[in-house]
């Protein structure tokens, strides 16, 4: 009986390993499980008998891989993973991915039924204390198949081809090496290396069309930090007017007055900093910069300098 329990526990552990990474060699699995390669092969067969499609490939880069089957087998979740899954499903119900809300609620109800009372109370506490703001009416939701295609391509280092429409309505075809998906809550972005432009790009998923994984893979190149790169891109380059401003206050103090992702900062000595931000109109930038609460000067462009001057004249007239 003890041996049966040990074998069952090992098979469960093996399944957890296969779910955690795309490919494992037999030697790696044997080392992690503390058994021989022969035992690993027997346990793989047990998983297949239970309906888990475990694929095996030989040669360089080969190994065992958990594939997609005709039916969806059970997933193994530890307590922390179960709570994380429930929280993510609640957020997805009001998120920016098209058609996911109802499916997320159905999945959440199934998870809630089998969750221990202790974990259920943790999830309920998070839900009761959290309010989710949905996407704006002007935001376009991302299709789930686009999101999944890009996520798999990032994971597997697979080339992607896609149509793309930029801010001005120009349509181009892109050949990409996808690296990372970044979400701001309202929108999804892909940081990728553009093979034709030979440079990194930040692309909005809702502006992509006909997204396809080509089936060919690439070798990962040194990449910038995805969150920082996309943050810089969406704070300025997506707007027709981009301004640089010197604030006469330390960078850490000024940065606290800007919402995340709306500007980039660089120190300009111990008591000043340079801020770069963008907007649809110069007047928006003038008003925004003035409400930060610190003295500043606009370095560029001329349109924003003029807008700040006009706003200053208007405010002076208002207090006569």
Curated annotation (Swiss-Prot):
<dbReference type="Pfam" id="PF08279">
    <property type="entry name" value="HTH_11"/>
</dbReference>
<dbReference type="GO" id="GO:0003697">
    <property type="term" value="F:single-stranded DNA binding"/>
</dbReference>
<comment type="function">
    <text>Transcriptional activator. Acts as a transcriptional activator of the MSMEG_1357-56 operon upon genotoxic stress. Controls adjacent genes that belong to the DinB/YfiT-like putative metalloenzymes superfamily by upregulating their expression in response to various genotoxic stress conditions, including exposure to H(2)O(2) or the natural antibiotic zeocin, as well as mitomycin C (MMC), diamide and UVC radiation. Upon genotoxic stress, upregulates two genes encoding proteins of the DinB/YfiT-like putative metalloenzymes superfamily, MSMEG_1357 and MSMEG_1356.</text>
</comment>
<keyword id="KW-0805">Transcription regulation</keyword>
<dbReference type="GO" id="GO:0042803">
    <property type="term" value="F:protein homodimerization activity"/>
</dbReference>
<keyword id="KW-0804">Transcription</keyword>
<dbReference type="GO" id="GO:0001216">
    <property type="term" value="F:DNA-binding transcription activator activity"/>
</dbReference>
<dbReference type="InterPro" id="IPR036388">
    <property type="entry name" value="WH-like_DNA-bd_sf"/>
</dbReference>
<comment type="subunit">
    <text>Homodimer.</text>
</comment>
<dbReference type="GO" id="GO:0001046">
    <property type="term" value="F:core promoter sequence-specific DNA binding"/>
</dbReference>
<dbReference type="InterPro" id="IPR036390">
    <property type="entry name" value="WH_DNA-bd_sf"/>
</dbReference>
<dbReference type="InterPro" id="IPR013196">
    <property type="entry name" value="HTH_11"/>
</dbReference>
<keyword id="KW-0010">Activator</keyword>
<dbReference type="InterPro" id="IPR051534">
    <property type="entry name" value="CBASS_pafABC_assoc_protein"/>
</dbReference>
<dbReference type="GO" id="GO:0080135">
    <property type="term" value="P:regulation of cellular response to stress"/>
</dbReference>
<keyword id="KW-0238">DNA-binding</keyword>
<dbReference type="InterPro" id="IPR001034">
    <property type="entry name" value="DeoR_HTH"/>
</dbReference>
<feature type="domain" description="HTH deoR-type">
    <location>
        <begin position="7"/>
        <end position="65"/>
    </location>
</feature>
<feature type="DNA-binding region" description="H-T-H motif">
    <location>
        <begin position="24"/>
        <end position="43"/>
    </location>
</feature>
<protein>
    <recommendedName>
        <fullName>Stress-involved WYL domain-containing regulator</fullName>
    </recommendedName>
</protein>
<feature type="region of interest" description="WCX domain">
    <location>
        <begin position="245"/>
        <end position="320"/>
    </location>
</feature>
<feature type="domain" description="WYL">
    <location>
        <begin position="139"/>
        <end position="218"/>
    </location>
</feature>
<dbReference type="Pfam" id="PF13280">
    <property type="entry name" value="WYL"/>
</dbReference>
<dbReference type="GO" id="GO:0042772">
    <property type="term" value="P:DNA damage response, signal transduction resulting in transcription"/>
</dbReference>
<dbReference type="InterPro" id="IPR026881">
    <property type="entry name" value="WYL_dom"/>
</dbReference>
């Amino acid at each position: 009986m003890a041996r049966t329990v040990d074998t069952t526990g090992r098979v469960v552990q093996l399944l957890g390993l296969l779910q955690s990474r795309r490919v494992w060699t037999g030697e790696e699995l044997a080392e992690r499980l503390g058994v021989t390669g022969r035992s690993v092969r027997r346990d793989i067969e047990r998983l297949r008998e239970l309906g888990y499609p475990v694929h095996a490939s030989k040669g360089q880069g080969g190994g065992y891989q958990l594939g997609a089957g005709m039916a969806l087998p059970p997933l193994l979740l530890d307590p922390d993973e179960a709570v994380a899954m429930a929280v993510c499903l609640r957020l997805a119900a009001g998120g920016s991915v098209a058609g996911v809300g109802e499916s997320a609620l159905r999945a959440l109800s199934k998870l809630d039924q089998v969750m221990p009372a202790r974990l259920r109370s943790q999830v309920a506490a998070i839900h009761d204390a959290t309010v989710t703001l949905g996407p704006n009416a002007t935001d376009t939701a991302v299709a789930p198949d686009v999101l999944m295609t890009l996520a798999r391509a990032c994971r597997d280092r697979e080339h992607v081809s896609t149509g793309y429409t930029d801010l001005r309505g120009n349509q181009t075809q892109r050949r990409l090496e996808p690296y990372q998906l970044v979400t701001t809550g309202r929108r999804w972005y892909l940081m990728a290396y553009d093979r034709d432009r030979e440079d990194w790009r930040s692309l909005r998923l809702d502006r992509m069309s006909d997204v396809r994984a080509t089936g060919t893979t690439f070798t990962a190149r040194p990449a910038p930090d995805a969150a920082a790169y996309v943050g810089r891109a969406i704070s300025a380059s997506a707007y027709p007017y981009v301004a640089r401003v010197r604030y006469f206050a330390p960078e850490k103090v000024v940065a606290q007055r800007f919402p995340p992702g709306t500007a980039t900062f660089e120190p300009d000595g111990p008591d000043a900093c340079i801020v770069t931000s963008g907007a649809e109109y110069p007047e928006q930038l003038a008003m925004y910069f003035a409400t930060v609460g610190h003295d500043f000067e606009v370095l560029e462009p001329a349109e924003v300098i003029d807008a700040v001057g006009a706003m200053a004249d208007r405010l002076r007239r208002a207090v006569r």
